[in-house]
Amino acid sequence: MSRDRGTSSQKIDYGYGQVCYENGELIKDLLLTNVQQEHGIIQMRNGSNAKLPDIKTGDMLRILPNHACATAAAHNCYNVVNNKNEVTNVWDRFNGW
């Protein structure tokens, strides 16, 4: 994750990222609203009528970050996974800006 709020001045602000179930299904109006070095905070979008999902401790979620350069730069390659979490490809990282 990144502290970059790339969507803050856009028509729709997605905080630090959109929250999904482990299978990649978006959770309506659930956003990553704050990030720290070791954790993040997820909340419903202000004014949302969506129902808060029943997420329990230990449930796996995915975040669609609005910016991930710092995270991506920490890895030599990226694992591409399918909907069963099986690695289907490995992408080498392009170095340099």
Residue ranges, per PLM feature:
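Active-site anion/phosphate-binding pocket segments in diverse small-molecule metabolic enzymes
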Residues: M1-W97
